[in-house]
């Protein structure tokens, strides 16, 4: 899937319902109800410049609702923003709820700090009073959402600025949902026989989450390694050595072996149009084919809004990809290692390829031997990798897991602490969670998970919650 489709503005259908009974009512100075609503619409649209809007005009009649449905369907909107501009007859709204194809919707009610009128004795003030009856319209319309019933509707209320921010959050989740349905997961080349808990149902993956899955054989991997040009290998090797210090005990020929193993994955992802590359980096066939496991993370994945994850964990790959789509940031793949109760912290990280390309933290990366496999008999045993002390700061930690045909999305906030490189073979950091560390993991153990999580700078729990609700996931925000 090309980058432009993954990084575009969310497409929203704007559904604004108003009363045909009030439409032509007029005051002597400030125009008709319709004139005032047209001005209100311009203010609403101007607050949504972060969206690619489909706006069919104010919905007064059945024909307006039908026009809106056709426009939204033709334009393949990611979601719908629905708002009553005052009290209104509800026939057009109910028809829309019944007939509009399934798409997420955010149903909004906007409150004002203060009314523009004190009494309704003046005719213009009376029209303003009618225009201000958004609450009665929303209350009237809310029951039909449940009675139809209409799935995937989020109800929000607040000032215009507050509602706009909630729409912004919702839009990121809705775009992610749409992109997932056109994405491709590439698994090289089989499930992880060492970790059965990572297995998921691939039919459900497509029908309930969206991506297709393609299996990428090791025979292809070997061919991609073999056809790498010397110039291509040298270019990437020089890029890495110019950016990062290489430790003295790294053998250069083994470094080149790892560069080749990494570049072949990038080229396979590119040629097969893979958005989420799930790499079984501990399978013996990986080492037999490449002589080592890939240890670097080509910037191509970030440029293409794609991800690369290890250990054949499709669920962990998906949550990494979701966070990539939502945030556009560098996302890291971790497993919690151990708790240090004295400090209220846990160590976490992972071996294998991990995104080390954050431009602000290039000083946290060393090219170091993968000592875990240094004493094996594989061709490039002890080949190096990008040893990354994961960037400090507050992060969202999230995991996605399958249980009996349902999915669970678990997230929390953790602080990555600054410090030196500590754990050989693993990109890593020390985390201090906002929840007391023993309580956090006891709660996760009771929910039931696996060991793999994605972490990214910032708080994205609101976006993850909206996405989970759209996708029908169980959602756990541990705080």
Describe each region flagged by the PLM.
Residues 20-38, 128-135, 193-198:
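Glycine- and acidic-residue-enriched helix-capping/strand-helix junction motifs
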Residues 86, 95-122, 127-137, 299-312:
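Short, acidic/small-residue loops that bind anionic groups at enzyme active sites
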Residues 237-326:
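Long, internal scaffold/assembly segments composed of regular secondary structure
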Residues 302-421:
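C-terminal catalytic subdomain
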Residues 38, 375-479:
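Extended hydrophobic packing segments that form well-structured cores
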Residues 10-12, 113-237, 243-247:
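Cap/lid and interdomain-hinge subdomains that line or gate substrate/regulatory clefts
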Residues 65-77, 94-97, 262-271:
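Short, well-structured alpha-helical segments in soluble
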Residues 77-86, 106-108, 274-280:
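Periplasmic-binding protein-like
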